[in-house]
Amino acid sequence: RINVETGITITDGTINRSTPAKVVAGAYTNSFAGTTATTLYDLDANENVLAKQNPPNDGTLENVGPLGVTLNGQGAFDIAGGANGLVLAALRSGASGPFTLYTLSLTSGAATLYRNTTGDASLSLIGGASGPVVRDIAIRF
């Protein structure tokens, strides 16, 4: 790793998790000008959890909780506003096919189909069987 202010290289510490992490996406709370504090959250596809990276620059992951969905190694998410803002994720549970739009809880990790009161997952899909791979998602706040 490189310190962007000084240019000095830093050796990362030992990763200390029961299962090696497979971080497929990350998002910050309070990611806007003038903020005094921020928290980095990650999606770990090996454990299917929302994790907090604490401290952000050390790469230490603390599990927040299970997503309740299985990730196949692809996904994207963003947090609009502060810690109580909109947390939106596009996740793919199969090896191919469409992504599904979810909201995530920053306190429990639980994924809920986005604005879908019927429970019909097809109403929250992005793309079809050959739809595009979602690499990033951004919410304008």
What do these predicted regions represent?
Residues T19-A37, L71-N84, V133-F141:
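Structural signature of eukaryotic scaffold interfaces centered on beta-propeller domains
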Residues R1, A37, N46-P55, A95-T103:
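Structural motif
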Residues P66-L67, L91, F99:
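An amphipathic alpha-helical core segment
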Residues I2-T19, K52-T70, A111-A129:
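Beta-propeller fold detector
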Residues T36-D44, N84-S93:
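Short beta-strand elements that form the blades of beta-propeller/WD-repeat-like
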Residues T107-S108, D120, I126-F141:
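Non-transmembrane domains of secretory- and envelope-associated proteins
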Residues N3, A27-N30, D42-D44:
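Short, structured patches in soluble enzyme cores that scaffold and shape functional sites
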Residues D78, A95, T100-T117:
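A structural motif
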